Amino acid sequence: MATYTSTIQIGSIECKLPYSPAPFGLVAGKREVSTTTDPFASLEMQLSARLRRQEFATIRTSKNGTCMYRYKTDAQIARIQKKREEREREEYNFQMAASSVVSKITIAGGEPPSKLESQVRKGVIHTTPRMRTAKTYRTPKLTEGQMNHLIKQVKQIMSTKGGSVQLISKKSTHVHYKEVLGSHRAVVCTAHMRGLRKRVDFRCDKWTVVRLQHLARTDKWTNQVRATDLRKGDSGVILSNTNLKGHFGRSSEGLFIVRGSHEGKIYDARSKVTQGVMDSMVQFSSAESFWEGLDGNWAQMRYPTDHTCVAGIPVEDCGRVAAIMTHSILPCYKITCPTCAQQYANLPASDLLKILHKHASDGLNRLGADKDRFVHVKKFLTILEHLTEPVDLSLEIFNEVFKSIGEKQQSPFKNLNILNNFFLKGKENTAREWQVAQLSLLELARFQKNRTDNIKKGDISFFRNKLSAKANWNLYLSCDNQLDKNANFLWGQREYHAKRFFSNYFEEIDPAKGYSAYENRLHPNGTRKLAIGNLIVPLDLAEFRRKMKGDYKRQPGVSKKCTSSKDGNYVYPCCCTTLDDGSAVESTFYPPTKKHLVIGNSGDQKYVDLPKGNSEMLYIARQGFCYINIFLAMLINISEEDAKDFTKKVRDMCVPKLGTWPTMMDLATTCAQMKIFYPDVHDAELPRILVDHETQTCHVVDSFGSQTTGYHILKASSVSQLILFANDELESDIKHYRVGGIPNACPELGSTISPFREGGVIMSESAALKLLLKGIFRPKVMRQLLLDEPYLLILSILSPGILMAMYNNGIFELAVKLWINEKQSIAMIASLLSALALRVSAAETLVAQRIIIDTAATDLLDATCDGFNLHLTYPTALMVLQVVKNRNECDDTLFKAGFPSYNTSVVQIMEKKLSKSLERCLERFNLAGKIIRNMVLIQSKTLYHSVHKTHRKGRFERVIQHITTSILGPRCPGGQRHCLRIERAI
């Protein structure tokens, strides 16, 4: 074998090694490398089933926000895979199918049926089959078990939300739930809670008792109740008579309804007691004396209503609104305080009116979101605010008038001077002064009329007054928002308030009497026949045509009676209509309609559905009372919000003035008055008015038409045209004609005195000061007072003690922070008071402190005067500052003259009285702190015992005693008493 040499170079060393190469056959073959092994293959194989299920899972979120998988079952996964394979197979077959074009569609390759035979046209159906099916309603019937289950569910809902349930049997029983004795319990309304004292305080039948047994079983029904636990305010509470401990009276049916206590014994409201027990029993209703006075006189003084009253407003909200009304009309710190009442009575009329306006405005703001529920309170406060709004009286105009004619006392200058004085007094004028002013205005009008006599006489033969053939465009009857789907007018709320007309001035048609009993309409000088009998339509055409002719009544031709003129010119709306030849247009037969208001004088008349009355019977105006249809037509143009006020004004103001058979002038005058209150009625269309010159009567045509024909027709077709009759300068005979009347069956119309007509609203100095004292030691209350009534700060100058107490509590600093960006004048007042408190604290005597305060009144008054302001206490603050300023100026003058004015004893008595009020507030604050402290100690004991073992009770009692002694002090006379009280509680 050959030997070869191989050279290996290692650095600088060269090494030669011999070697023999191996033969070719012995060379090792190439080694095959095995496949790569995945270390996670086994893990993936184990998790493949889980991942496969996770692929079909959905994600859901738990209540705490954690997202997790919701896995499908094996059956669901199989169904999903099967549907997926079917969709893939269908898609594949569709994609691989050969393309095709549909060019013709036949039935089995034959001809269409339309070519095989001719179509035979059958009879045409001219009617549409009825598609709607009649619905039948079954009366729900409940078994005894279902009824009990329903009562149980209602009880659970109402007891949770503090609602109420009404049980209706022979009489209604109202059950409400409130928290009593630590749980929600059922409460019924007893007689003494309504202000009535009866020997049996609560009565109910057996059915009601059974229902009360179910409704009263609330949570903690079986808890034991002691007689000493019951307090005032627990009247009517239903308790279990088997769980009572103490001196209780007799009860039955497993229920005990709390009434009151007599000689330590609690009586059931269903028990009949003697007269002596009833008189001496202590009722458990809160504020019993107050409600006795209120409820005892409420029923006697309330006014009759035209509806059935229901309790639809929560009592708590009513109480809050009553508080708003009281503080808006008669503000006081205590309603029983005679000083508040006297100070209110001593206010000048001008100041009272200003404060009334301000308090009414603040009352509306306090009402807030409840304005929609308490619309009557909103309306009253709005009217009060409007009536007491300050009038801008110009003294310059008064002086100019007085300089011109002040010394002249003859007419008409005397009347002008009276009006000048009247305008200067503004809203302080009395009713007598209003009457004198109106008489003076009447005298001036007569003087002007007599002075300008320019009445001209014209020739009646040339008089023409054609009736327009075009109908008036009534926007209110054309607006889509006021029409239903059949284009009929929607009365809305006006329909409800129109019942004041129907109940007082209309009567129902009695079908038993027949229509003939209502055909003749009586008036002072004759009769007019209605077409009400034509509601019975004869089917004979000749008879029908005969009835359509009517009964003709001849009227005189066109004369001076038919015209009205002013300043020699005709007032055409106040005249009778004529034809082209000058002859009068005579009325024809007007057919009757059912339950319609017929309006419009020109063109085609308009028929408006009458508002629904109290029944479905037909209504007709009472004898001599047809002019109410004019006010009913005006109601169409009244908005739904003003409908109530409009109908009341017509009932209480217009109708009593018109009296029986008013003249056209009086009717027009009342319409003019209503137009001032409601301007939208100026274009209200009127019913057709017929003029009877023979009897000097104007007839207002209603829905029953007129059988009598031949009357003249008045051209006036709207309220604005009818108002033209209300003019003394109008020369017209028609304005003195009679129209309609008032029924004698409405004696209540004379009783229109409002119970709210007297009284007013003012924040007196005493009430404002008490309100300020209430918040000195209550930061939250004071913050709210500063936001609502910042001018309460001014009243702190009445007492140096109050001023320094407010400074020490940081109230002035808080006021500056609250108002520095809103109203800088209030922030300046707070800064001045803060500086004043520092100077007062440096004074050594009370008299010196008062002198410092009185001296600063001028600067405070200059900073406070800020024009018109809506805050309740703004006028009070100005009045206080003005009094202090004037007193300081007078005292300064007397002091310079050598007469010292300050009486040390008087100042000390005043300060002592105000300081006592401040101390009482602080005592109440401390008492509240003690109560809270005791409650915390008792609650901590309960929590301690619930967590720790019972044998540690003694140690805990010693700790509590030590804490109590540390708080109250070892020498505190009440310390031992408090310790004993807490130990007993433990």
Curated annotation (Swiss-Prot):
- Which residue numbers delimit the Peptidase C6 domain? 618-740
Q: Where is this site: Cleavage?
A: F284, S285, G740, G741
For this protein, what post-translational modification is recorded in UniProt? Potyviral RNA is expressed as two polyproteins which undergo post-translational proteolytic processing. Genome polyprotein is processed by NIa-pro, P1 and HC-pro proteinases resulting in the production of at least ten individual proteins. P3N-PIPO is cleaved by P1 and HC-pro proteinases resulting in the production of three individual proteins. The P1 proteinase and the HC-pro cleave only their respective C-termini autocatalytically.
The UniProt keywords, alphabetically, are: Host cell junction, Host-virus interaction, Hydrolase, Inhibition of host innate immune response by virus, Protease, Serine protease, Suppressor of RNA silencing, Transport, Viral immunoevasion, Viral movement protein
From the record, which residues define motif Involved in interaction with stylet and aphid transmission?
334-337
Which residues pair up as cystines? none
* Ranges where the Peptidase S30 domain occurs: 141-284
Q: What is this protein called?
A: P3N-PIPO polyprotein
Annotated source species: Potato virus Y (strain Hungarian) (PVY)
